[in-house]
C-alpha cells in the first residue's frame, strides 16, 4: 500500500517546526544569557530586541495567508528558513547592542515563515478525518526544537565558539528545510490528483483567500474574540512560566536538577500532544482546552506551594502535559468552528495576537518578581490567567 503523500508533508512540517522553534523561539532565550555574559550587554536591552523579534514576526504572520497565496507555501517556507538562519547569525555576530534590532528584523521575518501559521498551512489541506493526529504530530516538532537543538547549540558554542556553532547548526537546518520544502511542500493535492485523506471533495477548499471573512469582521465575532482571548491569556501565562522555570526551581533544586525538570516538562508536552491527537476525535475543542488548562493550574499550584523534588516533578509533569496541547488545540478549534476558506486567515491572526501578547510575558513576570521579591505572586498570576483563559473559551462555546 502506497503511503499517502500527506504524511510526508506532516513530517516536513515537523522538521520545519523543529528548526523554526529552535532558532525562532528557544535559542533567542539562550542568547539572552550568552550575550549578556559574553558581551556585557544589559538584559533589558537584549530582552527588548527579543520582543522586537517576536512583534515583527507577529505583524508578518497576520498576512501569512495572503503571502502564501501570492508566492507559494514552499517558496515562502524555504526563504523563511534562510532568513531565520541569517538572522541568527546576525544575532551572534553583533558587536553593538543596536545591531541586535537589525538582526531581529531578519530573524523575525524568518520565524514568521516557519512558525505555527506555516505549520498549519502545510498540514491543513491534506487531512480531514485524521487532521487532529496530523496536526499534533507536526506540532511535536515545536517541542523537539527545544529538546535537541538548544542543548546541542549550547554545547557546540562552548566547543567551537558562538558564531561557528550558529553557522553550522543554522546553516544545516536551513539547507534541510529548503530541500524538504522543494520535495514535499511544492506538490499539491491538485497536482498529484489526490483528495484530503478520508474526506470527499469540497468546493470550499478551492476558494481563494479573497473570499474569506474580512479581518475587521472577524474581530467583531464572538467565536473569534473568545478563541483569540482564551489562547492569548493561556500562552502569556505559559510562556511567562517557562521562561522563568529554571530561575524558579534552581534555588531549591540546583541548576542540574532544574534542567532535568525542564526536560521532563518538555517530554510530557510531546506525550500529551501525541495522545490527544490520537484520542480527541470529535470532542469539543474548547472544553478540551479548558480541561487542559485546569490540569496545568494544578501543576502551577504545586510549583507555588512546595519545594519537595517529587512534588515539583508532579507539578512540572501536569503543567507539561498541557504545554504542547495549547499550540495544537487552537488550529483544531479553528478548523471545527470556521469554514475551510477562513481557517488559514483565522489561525494566522490568532497566532499573531498570541505572539504579540506573549512577547511581553517574560518581562512582566520579571517585573512582578522584582516587585514582590519572589515567585509566589507571579505564579498566582499565571494560575489566574489560565483560569480566565478557560472561562473565555467556555463563554464562546455558550455563545455559538
Regions found by a protein language model. Give the residues of each.
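Extracytoplasmic
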Residues: 8-43, 64, 150, 241-246
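Conserved MFS/SLC helix-loop-helix module at the cytosolic interface between two early adjacent transmembrane helices
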Residues: 59-97
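Intracellular juxtamembrane helix-capping segments at the cytosolic ends
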Residues: 113-127, 325-338
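C-terminal transmembrane helical hairpin of 12-TM major facilitator-type secondary transporters
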Residues: 265-269, 275, 282-333
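Helix-to-loop junctions at the C-terminal end of transmembrane segments
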Residues: 60-72, 273-284, 369
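Extracytoplasmic gate region of multi-pass secondary transporters
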Residues: 28-32, 219-271
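Helix-loop-helix hairpin linking two adjacent transmembrane segments in secondary transporters
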Residues: 142-189
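Interfacial helix-cap and linker-helix signal at transmembrane-aqueous boundaries
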Residues: 35-36, 67-68, 148, 152-160, ...
Amino acid at each position: 500500500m502506497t503511503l499517502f503523500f500527506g504524511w510526508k508533508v506532516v513530517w516536513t512540517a515537523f522538521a520545519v517546526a523543529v528548526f523554526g522553534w529552535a532558532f525562532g523561539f528557544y535559542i533567542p532565550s539562550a542568547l539572552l544569557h550568552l550575550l549578556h555574559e559574553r558581551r556585557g550587554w544589559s538584559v533589558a536591552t537584549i530582552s527588548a530586541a527579543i520582543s522586537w523579534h517576536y512583534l515583527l514576526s507577529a505583524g508578518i504572520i497576520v498576512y501569512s495567508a495572503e503571502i502564501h497565496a501570492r508566492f507559494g507555501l514552499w517558496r515562502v517556507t524555504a526563504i523563511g528558513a534562510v532568513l531565520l538562519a541569517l538572522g541568527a547569525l546576525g544575532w551572534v555576530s553583533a558587536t553593538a547592542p543596536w545591531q541586535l534590532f537589525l538582526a531581529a528584523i531578519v530573524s523575525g521575518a524568518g520565524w514568521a515563515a516557519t512558525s505555527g501559521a506555516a505549520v498549519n498551512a502545510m498540514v491543513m489541506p491534506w487531512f480531514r478525518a485524521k487532521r487532529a493526529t496530523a496536526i499534533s504530530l507536526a506540532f511535536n516538532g515545536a517541542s523537539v526544537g527545544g529538546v535537541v537543538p538548544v542543548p546541542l547549540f549550547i554545547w557546540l558554542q562552548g566547543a567551537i565558539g558562538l558564531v561557528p556553532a550558529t553557522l553550522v547548526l543554522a546553516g544545516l537546518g536551513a539547507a534541510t528545510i529548503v530541500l524538504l520544502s522543494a520535495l514535499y511542500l511544492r506538490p499539491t493535492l491538485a497536482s498529484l490528483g489526490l483528495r484530503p485523506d478520508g474526506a470527499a471533495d469540497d468546493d470550499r477548499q478551492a476558494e481563494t483567500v479573497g473570499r474569506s471573512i474580512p479581518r475587521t469582521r472577524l474581530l467583531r465575532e464572538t467565536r473569534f474574540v473568545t478563541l483569540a482571548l482564551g489562547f492569548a491569556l493561556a500562552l502569556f501565562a505559559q510562556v511567562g512560566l517557562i521562561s522563568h522555570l529554571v530561575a524558579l526551581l534552581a534555588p531549591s533544586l540546583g541548576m542540574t536538577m532544574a534542567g532535568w525538570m525542564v526536560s521532563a516538562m518538555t517530554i510530557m508536552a510531546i506525550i500529551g500532544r501525541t495522545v490527544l491527537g490520537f484520542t480527541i476525535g470529535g470532542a469539543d475543542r474548547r472544553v478540551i482546552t479548558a480541561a487542559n488548562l485546569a490540569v496545568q493550574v494544578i501543576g502551577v499550584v504545586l510549583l507555588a506551594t512546595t519545594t519537595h523534588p517529587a512534588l515539583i516533578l508532579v507539578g512540572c509533569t501536569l503543567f507539561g502535559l498541557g504545554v504542547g496541547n495549547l499550540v495544537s488545540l487552537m488550529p483544531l478549534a479553528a478548523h471545527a468552528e470556521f469554514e475551510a476558506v477562513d481557517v488559514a486567515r483565522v489561525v494566522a491572526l490568532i497566532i499573531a495576537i498570541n505572539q504579540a501578547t506573549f512577547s511581553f510575558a517574560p518581562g512582566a513576570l520579571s517585573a512582578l518578581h522584582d516587585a514582590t521579591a519572589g515567585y509566589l505572586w507571579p505564579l498566582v498570576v499565571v494560575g489566574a490567567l489560565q483560569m480566565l483563559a478557560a472561562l473565555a473559551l467556555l463563554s464562546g462555546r455558550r455563545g455559538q
